[in-house]
Amino acid sequence: AMADAGVKYGLTKQQALTLAAQAVAGSAEMVLSCGEHPEKLKDNVCSPGGTTIAAVCDLEKNGFRGIVQSAVCACVAKADEMSK
């Protein structure tokens, strides 16, 4: 989805995939390396009135947390089903 948005705004598919992967990898590395809760990290990287907080607000408005939790629950349920 992130890469598709990049293409929408003029990046090539490869550029968009690379940037999206780097963003995800960078976020994961930050969580793994510093030991801070992701909420604290979010607070650290979001500037007042900035682009990141605008994106975070949009994710929250559109139910991102619930969508991710639902997907994890579906994965666990399917894994349980497959293990029987």
Where do the protein language model's features map onto the residues?
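NAD(P)-dependent Rossmann-like dehydrogenase/reductase catalytic/cofactor-binding core
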Residues: 17-84
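Anionic-ligand binding region
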Residues: 1-18
